């Protein structure tokens, strides 16, 4: 069983959204079978993203070299921009998410998803991909969004991606994915929040 100390947030970028700079976090999880990376941030800006004014903080080379497994919560540009750093490695994603990303040119930056050596492992529903690491569908932000549940000795921890932009939004439980996370009552990280917390449902 993992410890929550095995989970480390990594600031991968920040973007301009709603007039403010929003951080974009990814996470590493130390695991006996190798380092797991949840989301990959952004490696470089792209002309299509000019309005977001992204500032990218590429993953350290030594971290990239250690990664054994990649998980995408979803395939929007700020969560999959570093996927191409991992040709040949398994990248776990919900099948619906990958299909949607490939079907709509406005969904993401296509070449950041489909690159030479891309090896996607598609899932349909909840699955344990490594002992103590589960993928849980959490639709809402996108139809194929998923969260990562780490079964830690202190209790489960959730790496939530964009299941919500903020804990205030998460607490309202307006989407199916948000309600699933709230039901877990677990310590939760969000991609645009700097610290984790146990979310509380709000009326």
Can you describe what each PLM-predicted range is?
Residues 1-55, 182-184, 200-203:
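Zn-dependent metallo-beta-lactamase
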Residues 14-15, 34, 42-45, 77-78, ...:
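Short, solvent-exposed loop/turn segments at secondary-structure junctions
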Residues 21-23, 121-123, 142-144:
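Residues that act as N-cap/strand-start positions at coil-to-secondary-structure junctions
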Residues 34-36, 69, 155-159:
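Structural motif
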Residues 42-49, 57-78, 85, 90-137, 143-203:
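Metallo-beta-lactamase
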Residues 81-87, 199-202:
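Metal-dependent catalytic neighborhoods of phosphoester/phosphodiester hydrolases
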